[in-house]
Amino acid sequence: GILGMNAGPYNEVIKFKARDFSMMRYLKRHYPAEMAYIQPPKPSTDGLSTINSLIPMLKKVENEYVKYYTKTFTSLLTSKEVVTGLTKFLRHKKGDNLIGWNMLEQVKPDGKIGSETLAAMPILNQSSNEENLICILQCALCCNKYSVDINGIYNDAVVKVVQEFQQNVGLTSDPMVVSGEVNRRTWAALLQSKGDPDRKANACDCTEKLDLIKAKALKEAGYNFVGRYLSNASDSNKGITKEELDIITTAGLNVFAIYQEGSITPEYFSEEQGKTDAVKAFEAARVSKIPNHEVIYFGVGYDFTEQGCREKVIPYFSGIVKAMKDKGSWYKVGIYAPRNICNIIIGAKLAESLFIADKSTAYSGNLGYALPDNWAFDQYETETMTGNGTKFQFNKVIASGVYAGFNGLTRCGHENYRDCTLHD
């Protein structure tokens, strides 16, 4: 959209193009110094939808702009310029009057936003009259697939869209968030995949086995769900057991199951490997007495391009689905991966539930991509818990409520009840 930041593969925002290009022309004319900060994006085909699909909309704009944008059009939703472009412009528009508003210095090369910038992010609501900042907010909403006019006015329509965004990214229960108002929580969620790392989590995942002290400490800290791994990698002892599941249940937590062993290089992924991993995950789930019909999230720990995802990850998940079907479809297939990979796999109908790996803000599959719809879990920051005689590390996660996980008392298979202790 505006600032040369086109919405790429999302057809829903194609309708914004003519308006955004007109806004670009307006900004160049009235704010030449500020616009000098924004460089035309480098051509790329990664995540790029076909330019021909945009031509009808582009024809509504003056000829010189059509020519310019058809030459430079790219999907910045897969580019590291997306955050730096918006934040540089935002800092320059805001000026140096706001102490600590160090956008240029605080935005890291990997797309992370520094703590000083987070602390200095402005509050915007219907009483705000800072047209320039509201324009940037509206632009950021467009880049996240939300339809809003870019006019610098914080009207009822903007309030409604902000509320919808806050709901969809899991901010509504945060005590720091005011519905329809934008502060650091909402700004961060708009500008980087992990959002504000300081926000409170209601779930977590960890590779470390939990004893009762650790599990109770998590519950007392407000965590209700914990992601645990089904099996042990060659150099680890991270696999959940039936005994640990009972301990977690006693502490009042629910579990969601993760399977990930060697999936951190592109060479790992193939249809045959998917079949192998599905069988291993199935067998581990049976041994640990995981109830029937629960989700197993298969991890993708590599930053694939869209092309790489189609060449490697789709065959991998095709193998998983085939093997699970051969085993009787006792478990649902989920995916644990960056945003764009999740979108591609769910679009190919190869997974039923999404665990978003948003912590890696520098991943090309995260930076600039909107949070997928109907996500179940969103991982965003690493935390270390100390106290009660224990110290351990885990990842902070937001649970949307789409999937509640399970515990040792969950009816196996739900309506198709079968005692999970009878698993072979």
Regions found by a protein language model. Give the residues of each.
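Substrate-binding cleft of extracellular glycoside hydrolase catalytic domains
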Residues: 1, 209, 235-308
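Cell-envelope/ECM-targeting effectors and their regulatory/trafficking segments
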Residues: 1-225, 229, 424
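Functionally critical loop-and-helix segments that line ligand-binding/catalytic clefts
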Residues: 4-44, 199-206, 342-424
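Conserved, mostly hydrophobic/aromatic
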Residues: 5, 218, 248, 298, ...
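Acidic (Asp/Glu)-rich catalytic clusters
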Residues: 19-32, 214-222, 238-257, 283-291, ...
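Loop/turn elements at helix/coil->beta-strand transitions in domains of secreted/extracellular proteins
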Residues: 32-35, 95, 143-144, 221-226, ...
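Active-site cleft segment of glycoside hydrolase catalytic domains centered on the general acid/base Glu
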Residues: 303-328
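Aromatic-lined carbohydrate-recognition surfaces of secreted/lumenal glycan-active proteins
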Residues: 325-344
